[in-house]
Amino acid sequence: MTGAATGPQSRTGERPSAPGRVHVESVGQGPPLVLLHGWALHSGLWGPLLPRLAARHRVHAVDLPGHGHSAATDPFTLEEIVAAVDAAVPVGEPLAVLGWSLGGAVAMTWARSQPARIARLALVCTSPRFVAGPDWPHAMAAATLSRFGDELSVAYRATLQRFLSLQLHGSDPGRAALALMRKHLFARGEPAPEVLGAALGILAAIDLRADAPSIAQPTRVIAGDRDTLAPPAAGRWLAAAMPDATYAEIGGAGHAPFLSHPDAFDHALGAFLDGR
């Protein structure tokens, strides 16, 4: 597709059946920007943000494997997810990548494995490690994440709705953002419970702390000061560990500041993605 657009346009209109096939929607003109969403959701959630970004960028909004219109990879691992996303995004000039939550871990892994392809990173409410441990207090307890996996098989929809509520817990304002997330949750079908459970396993296993100092791309780390899933302390740690990173914290925001605080989020992102 060429030219600017007023809304997202689909490169892959139908749910793909081939393992690893990835759905990408591309819109706008300018330097390329890839958007990577979080667990259990899909790229449709970026909708409110797209007009601002597409005014300055050629935006490629990706449904991560196993989510939205994208098939799961086989095997379903972080490395295979990264490889599938890399294969789906058009080849051209180096990319800016904005990753939220799980998408941030995908973005960091991609930047580490393909440093010539990724020019800069924006990491939103993400963490090098999503479960707490003796040497990492900046995360949820492992038992909490495990309980989500157990509950998926018992009360699938209720568990996902509760997860959405946790993302905006304490956010001010959060009610409108939560309504938007609920509207989009099943807009591209219901993700397979076994795939979401496997994705939780990936989240539980992620530990990118040793890799962070070797991710040299210019990086903007953005956190919500009320985020309980990826606490701001995790973002501050990332910004300090990465060699060319800056940090911004959005007051009153939970885990989805681009929805609850769009103007503050746009200010925090600033001209960073444009290389200025």
Predicted features, each with a name:
Residues 99-103, 107:
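Gly/Ala-rich beta-loop-alpha elbow adjacent to hydrolase catalytic centers
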Residues 112-113, 117-154, 195:
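Flexible "cap/lid" loop of the alpha/beta hydrolase fold
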